[in-house]
Design a protein with these regions (language model features):
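Short, acidic/turn-prone active-site loops that include or flank metal/cofactor-
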Residues: 133-139, 158-161, 182-185
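RNase H-like two-metal-ion nuclease catalytic core shared by retroviral integrases
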Residues: 165, 185-194
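A residue-level signal for conserved active-site and pocket-lining positions in enzyme catalytic cores
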Residues: 29, 69, 155, 188
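Phosphate-handling DNA/RNA-contact segment within nucleic-acid enzymes
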Residues: 7, 48-152, 166-167
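Acidic beta-strand-to-loop metal/phosphate-binding motif
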Residues: 112, 150-162, 181
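Metal-dependent DNA phosphodiester-chemistry modules and their immediately adjacent helices/loops
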Residues: 182, 192-209
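TOPRIM metal-binding catalytic domain and adjacent DNA-binding surface shared by DnaG-type primases
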Residues: 1-62, 67-68, 104-105, 205-209
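Short, aromatic/basic amphipathic alpha-helical patches
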Residues: 165-174
Length: 209
């Protein structure tokens, strides 16, 4: 009798499937400063041939959440303005912290930002260890415990009231936060595209670290 695949195995299978179609997203990704090499390293993909139950995600960017044990979740982002909603998650799956492997790589400090693309930008394109949350209101108490040991936590906040509120919420959590808010209407990725990696390092005073 054939044994059914575990949830972990199903996620790994889906990730590998979608990663094989990542080239379909390269026009979008390169427009946001994400190279093919970075996309491959983060195991980004496109839902071209959906796994069973993933039919609603066809044509979307697949963003895997990867831990030491492997793929633990996949979120799906619209690649065109007509795709609504912009982000979709799998039913019944609670949001998680993105790019948690950077927690072990980081030393005295780490960055936090909203969104997977922003976190990927800081981590892989700028060289700043970073974790990302699924949205400005998605912070959870156990995330705080994961970051408790850092001397500095740089919050790269979106350039809007929600972004500032998100950063202030992390201060209330007791983390040693330095707020780095982007200009109005901008986010971390858009400022990377416009001004490059050095701008984002300088904003945090990390240009010499």
């Amino acid at each position: 009798m054939k044994q059914s695949l575990s949830q972990k195995e199903l996620l790994e299978k889906a990730c590998a499937n979608y990663q094989a179609s990542v080239n379909l997203a390269l026009p979008y990704l390169t427009g946001r400063g994400i190279t093919a090499q970075v996309a491959q390293s983060a195991r980004l993909g496109v839902v071209e041939h959906p796994e069973i139950g993933h039919e609603a995600y066809v044509g979307r960017l697949a963003i895997p959440y990867i831990t030491k044990t492997g793929v633990v979740d996949i979120r799906f982002r619209a690649l065109t303005p007509d795709q609504e909603p912009k982000y979709m998650g799998m039913p019944g799956v609670k949001t998680k912290l993105y790019n948690v492997l950077d927690i072990e790589k980081a030393k005295d400090w780490i960055a936090v930002c909203e969104g997977e693309i922003d976190a990927l930008t800081l981590s892989r394109c700028v060289g700043i260890p970073c974790v990302g949350v699924a949205g400005a209101t998605s912070w959870k108490p156990h995330y705080t415990r994961l970051l408790d040991d850092f001397e500095r936590v740089y919050v790269y906040a979106d350039g809007d009231s929600a972004g500032l509120s998100f950063a202030k919420d992390l201060i209330k959590e007791g983390l040693p936060v330095t707020i780095i808010q982007m200009p109005e209407g901008e986010d971390t990725n858009s400022m990377f595209v416009k001004n490059g990696a050095e701008y984002l390092r300088e904003r945090a005073g990390l240009d010499n670290e």
